[in-house]
Amino acid sequence: MFSNSLLFAQQMSGFSFAGNSTAAFAQTKSAAFIKGAKPQGLQLDLYKLWDSQENINACNCMAKSGISLSYFNLGMPNLLGNALIASLFMEPQFEMSNRYIIGIKAHAGFVYANKKFDSNTNPGNLTYSSNISNYLALGLSSYYFINPKTAVNLSFIFNHISNGGLKNPNHGLNFPGFNFGLNYYFEKPNYHYSVSAKSKIDPAIAKYITVFYSATTANSYSTKRYAIFGLELSGVKKINGVLFATAALSMYQDNAVQQRLKQDSVSMQNQYRCGIASGIGFNMGKVNFASSLGVYVYDPINYYARIYHQHEISYQLNKQWAVGINLKAHTYIANYTDIRIKYLLN
């Protein structure tokens, strides 16, 4: 979606070091055991500013992206443990004044946490049951420059950890809070940009066909995983050089549901579902982040809530093909994480 020249555009680079102060909250009564947990952490970001005129024209902003590494004490060392997080982030930024910048920051990555659920040694932790889990975060950032190359930031960020339904129990851990840090730029950034020409946006809707695969357990205490296969037809419409809108029709064959039906002695053996969803995404070079909200139009069993949400990160291999990872959830509980292959039809 973005020109490949984005990868070689003139860049300003820098790093930041920050502290995180957050508080976990219980989404349901069954997650009340985390009440009072206050995860605290340290964070290192390495980033680039995409400040070429072409990218500014496309975004109508200053686009920033990078790698984030974090350490968190999750607030209950004997129950929730500690976590190491590695994520990619992107952040459209906007100048408010000579010294003041705001941005909207989205993270996607992975977390290693050391106190997973164990029926013998740690039965009380229902938030995650595998050491490696998914990490998602969304926040609003503000920056104030104290000199031409240095800025302090205060941000509000919503953090989420979940193993994506690969193993149960998996209530997930949500911990919103504040991030306070110091940012240093190797060269003085120039936020006094202007849009010299309106980028040409292709009016056509890109049409994709996607196949995906996952595997999950049938219940909270099973270790055997059952395959989930799916097919998705989607349309993508550019809003500008960074933002795009999506609409999709998805069909699923869920063998984990079929196994659950057998366990519950339900006579109707139907493992198929179909849903429609729409959402919005960000593009940065060959990497796309997208989130969508959907509803099942065919789900005869009704084991899950009718409404679901999805969060996808994908990488464009070439003009036609892309690969990605997608997290699907019902309300606060992840259903599964799938791997997917996408093909551009037009």
Predicted regions and their residues:
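Repeated loop/turn-to-beta-strand initiation elements of outer-membrane beta-barrel proteins
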Residues: 53-56, 98-102, 144-152, 188-191, ...
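Transmembrane beta-strands of outer-membrane beta-barrel proteins
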Residues: 13-19, 63-67, 102-106, 152-156, ...
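Outer-membrane beta-barrel "beta-signal"
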Residues: 24, 44, 174-194, 334-346
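Transmembrane beta-strands of outer-membrane beta-barrel pores
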Residues: 21-27, 48, 69-75, 108-116, ...
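Residues that define the transmembrane beta-barrel architecture of outer-membrane proteins
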Residues: 13, 36-42, 61, 80-86, ...
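Solvent-exposed loop/turn segments connecting transmembrane beta-strands
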Residues: 35-38, 73-83, 98, 168, ...
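Residues on the lipid-exposed face of transmembrane beta-strands in outer-membrane beta-barrel proteins
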Residues: 44-48, 88-94, 106-110, 138-144, ...
